[in-house]
């Protein structure tokens, strides 16, 4: 069993994510338009929401955890912290080295996705911080296992995946996305080097065997467009 996964993202008209690179809007202010995206995200009312590691560390926890003993537990099991919020914040940390200054992001309790080889000292640190965790295979990158555990152990029925492009691309490749909630910012990036909405860094075609069905189109304030698509897995 997996949660319903909605990829909720805002991009420029050329599909780029770096807001600092976007042109200024013709109507309104950039922060106001980004606020529309945030408001739509709250409407989705998912049980949990998720960032990729780079996005989280850049905005919240830039420091790295260091330990001289990298010995893992022989049989690691998921851990649910004693006190958790109604909504959860999920973070994929295949390096098992984020130094957390808080057990929450925007008031939502953190659940870390880790490799089974995570150092025992790091797991002990997370428990002392009141941070829940689960495992995604030996390398920490098996999203299918992670999502199954998130649903079956943590009771998450819906997840809002909010970038960045690398984690979106990984979920796309795994075939785990059920719906795309795409908010189009009325501006352009134009740079070939900017991260795209889906920025898969592996080999092959991550979207192979998948099709999109348009569910709805809404024109929001100041030229913002909200598109919703359903993913279909082609047999």
Regions found by a protein language model. Give the residues of each.
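Enzymes that bind and transform nitrogen-containing heteroaromatic metabolites
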Residues: 1-235
């Amino acid at each position: 069993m997996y949660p319903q996964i909605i990829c909720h993202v805002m991009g420029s008209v050329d599909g780029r994510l770096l807001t600092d690179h976007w042109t200024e809007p013709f109507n309104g202010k950039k922060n106001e338009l980004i606020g529309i995206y945030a408001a739509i995200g709250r409407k989705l009312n998912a049980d949990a929401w998720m960032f990729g590691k780079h996005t989280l560390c850049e905005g919240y926890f830039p420091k790295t955890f260091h330990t001289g003993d990298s010995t893992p537990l022989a049989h690691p099991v998921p851990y649910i912290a004693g006190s958790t919020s109604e909504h959860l914040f999920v973070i994929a940390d295949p390096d098992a080295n984020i130094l957390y200054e808080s057990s929450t992001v925007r008031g939502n309790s953190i659940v870390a996705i880790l490799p089974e080889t995570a150092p025992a000292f790091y797991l002990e640190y997370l428990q002392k911080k009141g941070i829940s965790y689960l495992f995604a295979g030996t390398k920490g990158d098996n999203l299918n296992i992670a999502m199954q555990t998130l649903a079956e152990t943590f009771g998450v029925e819906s997840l809002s995946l909010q970038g960045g492009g690398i984690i979106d691309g990984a979920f796309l490749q795994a075939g785990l996305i059920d719906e795309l909630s795409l908010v189009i910012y009325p501006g352009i990036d134009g740079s070939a080097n900017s991260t795209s909405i889906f920025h898969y860094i592996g080999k092959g075609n991550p979207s192979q065997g998948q099709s999109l069905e348009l569910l709805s189109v809404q024109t929001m304030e100041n030229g913002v467009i909200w598109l919703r698509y359903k993913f279909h897995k082609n047999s």
